[in-house]
A protein has these predicted regions:
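Phosphate-binding loop of NTP-binding sites
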Residues: 1-131, 135-144, 259-261
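Acidic, Mg2+-coordinating active-site environments of NTP-dependent enzymes
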Residues: 10, 90-237, 262
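Conserved cofactor-binding/catalytic machinery of classical short-chain dehydrogenase/reductase
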Residues: 24, 198, 249
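Buried hydrophobic packing segments
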Residues: 28, 32, 56-57, 196-206, ...
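Thr-Gly-centered strand-to-loop micro-motif
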Residues: 42-44, 69-70, 186, 200, ...
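Residue-level recognition of specific faces of alpha-helices
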Residues: 56, 70, 216-219, 226-229, ...
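Active-site beta-alpha connecting loops in nucleotide-dependent enzymes
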Residues: 223-225, 242-266
Length: 266
């Protein structure tokens, strides 16, 4: 049996990608909370498969003003199936990297599968992805005639970000439609700034103000096991990145550690 979401007149946002799905989804949930308060439905944890997604959507009620769902995959056809169920208004692909190669065979196959989320968009939906990504041409072809809202750190997109860091402190400046704002981020690393910029793009495509985007990103406190900061003994700082890993996410975590000052232990 197949559940298809229809007749829902609220923003229904979706996120997929090799890395950063859950972090981006939680950032978006925080942004939506800034705009809509408690009237937001979001995927719990990473319940992002063919069981978790329908369970999340079955929780939609008349009290909700927006929803954000996460979609994961480990074999061909899974994202297309999930997108066909949700029919989101706005969809984000965070990236396509070396994850689930055992089921997909190549990064190109992963990128193509991730991009099928755009084919499941509603007719007036918007695709969001990074204009700096090597798979931008592939994803643009999968979007077809639907709208896009690309983001970039190089300035070649409607939404432009600038990242700066000092030790484990980081900030993201956003420029969009003649407005600009800077926010402090709870998570270190340029990859997390990219997650935040993508989440901002989804929110802006859904009609949320840049002020609410900034408020939501500022309120975001991080996700368990994903570069969470803890106090250690003797003034040490422990970065917990133990949730899950693939080669690219491990490298991103090592890059964060390498950029810090003082003695370091991996």
């Amino acid at each position: 049996h197949r559940l298809t979401v229809s007749g829902i007149d609220i923003p229904l946002l979706a996120v997929t990608g090799s890395n950063g799905k859950t972090t981006s989804k939680e950032m978006l949930a925080s942004i939506l909370a800034a705009a809509y308060g408690d009237a937001v439905l979001a995927t719990r944890g990473n319940l992002n498969n063919d069981i978790g997604l329908p369970l999340t959507l079955l929780g939609l009620g008349s009290e909700h003003q927006a929803a954000i769902v996460e979609m994961g995959m480990n074999h061909p056809g899974e994202i297309a199936y999930l997108a066909g169920i949700a029919r989101p208004n706005v969809a984000l692909v965070t990236n396509a990297l070396r994850a689930h190669l055992e089921g997909m065979g190549s990064v190109e196959a992963i990128a193509r599968e991730k991009g099928t989320i755009f084919e499941g968009l509603s007719e007036d939906g918007t695709a969001v992805f990074c204009a700096d990504d090597p798979w931008v041409g592939l994803w643009q072809s999968q979007v077809g005639m639907r709208r896009t809202l690309c983001f970039s750190f190089s300035g070649q997109a409607p939404l432009v970000g600038a990242y700066r860091a000092h030790g484990l402190e980081s900030w993201l400046a956003l420029q969009y439609a003649g407005e600009s704002i800077e926010v402090a981020l709870a998570l270190p690393g340029e990859h997390n700034a990219r997650n935040a910029l993508g989440a901002a793009g989804v929110a802006l495509a859904a009609g949320i103000s840049l002020a609410d985007v900034a408020a939501g990103l500022s309120a975001f406190k991080g996700v368990k096991g994903r570069l969470q900061r803890h106090a250690g003994f003797g003034g040490a700082v422990v970065l917990d990145d133990t949730y899950n890993a693939n080669p690219d996410s491990v490298r991103a975590a090592i890059d964060v550690l390498a950029a810090t000052v003082g003695n370091k232990v991996l």
